[in-house]
């Protein structure tokens, strides 16, 4: 939703913030949000509308369902003792305000830009993102000889993690990476500004587009998202080339 890359069957990762000085605001907005989630997820004779995931809120599922904007901004910008993890900043690269008054949306974009512009330790950031990729791989093992268009090495998750690393590590020097234009657009921009060797960025963008199409088709037809390796040889090689260009030999450890 945030990255404008919603697929068939995708859940919605939502974070709810409010800007209201009323002392009961948190309680009131939490009740409203619970009703909203119920409306969006209720099972009907025609199925359900969306699955909702609120785990990206500050402190995950152990945190408050709704957060004041000031608390959210402090959390994301690492002010105070309760601060965001790197994987939450990865999510911020794809975040977008989808509902709310214009002023609050602008304040959110300011916070998002500040997070992306933060200068970071490149090797440390790389290690954290590679470690998170390993955890995702452990949680979604690929069985059999097929190529899973999302989770196999060289597939969509590898491409997405590489893009997120580029945005977080280079956003302080390349403002063109701040715009939330989706993975394909960001790969093209990273290629244009010299962050990727020719033609790695363009090839990975084409691969991501192909893998997305395969995923859409499989979900519409209620089919598995694994395809024969030979069907996606070029796309897989492009995804692996991107990962190697960004993370180096760490790809072998995923």
Model-inferred region functions:
Residues 1-254:
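A nucleotide- and high-energy phosphate-metabolite-utilizing enzyme signature
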